[in-house]
């Protein structure tokens, strides 16, 4: 008797999936899992590229006189022995510019962090900020659909973690404006060479610090409003370099590098701003001299009144009342008359 069971035709939909269908379904699921894993690996591999493009301000003109070189040489000395450098000084004295210059000359990626009172540890190291979903569909029985969704939290690295992993130079600007509790994560980085990621689960909670990783921090002096005094345990691990305003020759060179017009009396403007620095209770930094020189480039045939107007506008943001602006203008007029500044 001939067995024809394998040749029988069955009408209607199949009740069970064939082995090939099941293998194809599993293969699709495996491909999806592999795609997600590859995406995570690609993100990690491209971290170094993202570091160089996404987190640093544009490069500006940098003048290195003898006075500036003394600061940069000291910074490089400490960075060469893997000590974090903390630049402290009045606003507008050039801390950020020198920090970025030294960081760029290390020939390593540079990561930028700008501190403020709202900055948290998560803003520094990262957090679970994304989710990924994997869906599985199984029609084992023709009229029954089985669906399973797998939702996973996805960790997103923030600047400190990227810098630690890639051996970058971390420039932490306005470090002392961040509340001390947010900076506790730096303790283990500087002491044990390990970054702990609070909130992250599993073995990847701990990240070994790349041997090329370095840190430069900048802070205003403690008398400025909004400045938090960092905890002693962290300060004990930092090298502190106190900066002040540069000499007149250096300030003149810095201002001239920022102003393209050749007919602006840069030396006279710098001299006047240095005199105002002594006469006024507000801080008059090198940045103020740059702004004043830029303002004069936009003026047609500037005279003494124009100089007074420009200098008043530059410094008026540092006072709170109109009466203070009037007093400020009077001091500027007196200083201009005393110095006999000429615009030629």
From Swiss-Prot:
Domain of life: Archaea
Similarity-based family: Belongs to the CbbQ/NirQ/NorQ/GpvN family.
InterPro entries (UniProt xref): AAA+_ATPase, ATPase_dyneun-rel_AAA, CbbQ/NirQ/NorQ/GpvN, Gas-vesicle_GvpN, P-loop_NTPase
E.C. number: 3.6.4.-
The UniProt record lists the keyword Transmembrane: no
Additional remark text: Encoded in a 14-gene locus called c-vac which produces cylindrical gas vesicles only in the stationary growth phase.
Coiled-coil segments on the chain, per record: none
Binding, ATP: 89-96
UniProt gene name: gvpN2
Species the sequence originates in: Halobacterium salinarum (strain ATCC 700922 / JCM 11081 / NRC-1)
Record's function text: An ATPase that functions in gas vesicle formation. A minor component of the gas vesicle, also found in soluble extracts. Gas vesicles are hollow, gas filled proteinaceous nanostructures found in several microbial planktonic microorganisms. They allow positioning of halobacteria at the optimal depth for growth in the poorly aerated, shallow brine pools of their habitat.
GO biological process, alphabetically ordered: gas vesicle organization
Start-end of Basic and acidic residues biased regions: 18-52
UniProt-listed SMART domains: AAA
Catalytic activity: ATP + H2O = ADP + phosphate + H(+)
Subunit structure: Forms homodimers, a GvpN-GvpO heterodimer, interacts with GvpC and GvpL, might interact with GvpA.
Designated name of the protein: Gas vesicle ATPase GvpN2
Compartments reported by the entry: Gas vesicle; Cytoplasm
Region (Disordered): 1-55
């Amino acid at each position: 008797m001939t067995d024809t069971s394998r040749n029988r035709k069955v009408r209607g939909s199949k009740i069970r999936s064939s082995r090939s269908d099941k293998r194809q379904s599993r293969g699709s699921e495996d491909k999806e899992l592999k795609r997600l894993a590859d995406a995570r690996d690609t993100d990690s591999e491209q971290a170094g590229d993202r570091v160089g493009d996404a987190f640093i301000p544009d490069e500006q003109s940098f003048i290195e006189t003898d006075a500036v070189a003394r600061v940069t040489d000291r910074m490089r000395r400490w960075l060469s022995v893997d000590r974090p450098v903390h630049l402290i000084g009045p606003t507008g004295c050039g801390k950020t510019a020198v920090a970025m210059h030294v960081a760029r000359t290390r020939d390593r990626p540079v990561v930028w962090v700008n501190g403020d009172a709202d900055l948290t540890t998560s803003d520094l190291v990262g957090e679970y900020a994304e989710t990924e979903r994997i869906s599985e569909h199984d029609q084992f029985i023709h009229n029954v659909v089985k669906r399973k969704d797998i939702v996973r939290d996805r960790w997103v690295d923030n600047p400190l973690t990227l810098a630690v992993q890639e051996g970058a130079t971390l420039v932490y600007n306005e470090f002392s404006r961040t509340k001390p509790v947010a900076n506790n994560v730096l303790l283990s980085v500087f002491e044990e060479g390990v970054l702990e990621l609070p909130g992250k689960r599993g073995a990847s909670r701990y990240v070994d610090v790349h041997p090329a990783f370095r840190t430069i921090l900048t802070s205003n002096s403690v008398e400025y409003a909004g400045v938090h005094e960092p905890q002693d345990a962290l300060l004990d691990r930092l090298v502190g370099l106190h900066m002040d305003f540069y000499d007149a020759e250096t300030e003149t060179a810095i201002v001239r590098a920022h102003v393209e017009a050749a007919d602006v009396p840069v030396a006279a403007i710098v001299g006047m701003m240095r005199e105002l620095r002594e006469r006024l209770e507000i801080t008059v930094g090198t940045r103020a001299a740059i702004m004043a020189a830029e303002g004069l480039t936009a003026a047609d045939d500037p005279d003494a009144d124009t100089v007074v107007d420009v200098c008043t506008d530059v410094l008026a943001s540092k006072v709170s009342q109109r009466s203070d602006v009037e007093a400020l203008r009077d001091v500027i007029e007196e200083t201009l008359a005393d110095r006999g500044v000429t615009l030629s």
